[in-house]
Amino acid sequence: MKKVLLAVVGILFAATSFSQNALVASLSHGENVTYYYGIDALKNAVAAAASGDIINLSSGSFNATNISKGITVRGAGIDSPEPTYIVNEFLIDIPKDDAKRFMMEGIRCTNTMIFKGVFANPYFLKCQFNNIGRWDYEVTVSNIMFANCKITGELRAAANSSYILVNCFVSTLYKENDAAVTATNCVLIRGGEDFRGYNGQFFNCIFVSKDGGGYYAMPNVSQASNCIAVNFPSSFDLFRDLSVKPNCPSASKSYTEVFETFTGVYSDTEDFKLNEAGKAILGTDGKEIGLYGGLQPYDSTPTYPLISTMTVPAKTNDQGKMDVKVGISLPTE
């Protein structure tokens, strides 16, 4: 219990530092919690961390740093009033013999996150990314999982690597040969008309042509179930070459036939919710397709506790201490 409480204290401390306009990273190692301050707080915490440790970041913008340890990095949430940002490009390169899993939650990464090396099972939950790439053609990362994430630029799926997307928004998915992609309940967009790179397995997904073009269908090596196309030409069938495509209608739908407000232009306030007609299009599980169906409906709220209110008195008590009152918001089920 002591270990759990110490970890929670670290999370809460970091989550509230924005009220003091400070950048704080708390590093939890066993029963010990160490704090680092300033724009390089993340860099310094990562340097001091051991595999299996947890780093909690306050709101604000932190300089990026390369990560080569199976640690957990948490932020204040991507849709909180003051999110956590990691700025500049950085590498994820975990030694393949590291027994711990790398995890990231509740953080906005404003530049490019790059995979390097040979490792498995990194997990990204409730994060927002600009671009995701690979270091070179030798990269082999298996079971890269993104859940409840937004990728507003390009996800470049590296050859010899495997990706799992669960209830995510992806602006551009570029898949190299031999990369394996499985997407469930996702909204997937291309800025152009070419969906030839979308070879993988897709369930309950919505494919959107941003510019309304449609000249190349999905490759016949792909599989799609209970997916729809939006904003393609009326005569174009995105799924025409697929041999496995149950419940994937040939006719494209308009934005207004599916979404409440989305019209192809990304913004941080866009929630990608479906209107009543869109909700009537059911997935393989009998629930709505898109971000809010499936086993893990989209929700950007962090899964760990954060401070929701803090009252600091104007003066100390008769013992010379501050009677600070703290309200904690727990994640909803």
Question: What are these model-derived regions, one by one?
Answer:
Residues 60-61, 77-81, 229-235, 280-287:
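Acidic glycine-/aspartate-rich tracts in secreted/extracellular proteins
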Residues 25-63:
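Acidic Gly/Asp/Thr-rich repetitive segments characteristic of extracellular carbohydrate-active
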Residues 1-23:
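Bacterial Sec-dependent N-terminal signal peptides
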Residues 70-117, 131-132:
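Right-handed parallel beta-helix/beta-spiral solenoid domain characteristic of secreted/periplasmic
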Residues 115, 135-138, 145-270:
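Predominantly extracellular beta-rich ligand-binding scaffolds that present long acidic/polar faces
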Residues 287-322, 329-331:
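Short, compositionally biased P/S/T/A/G/V-rich stretches that sit at domain boundaries
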Residues 52-54, 59, 64, 70-72, ...:
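Detector for repetitive beta-architecture
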Residues 244-302:
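C-terminal accessory segments
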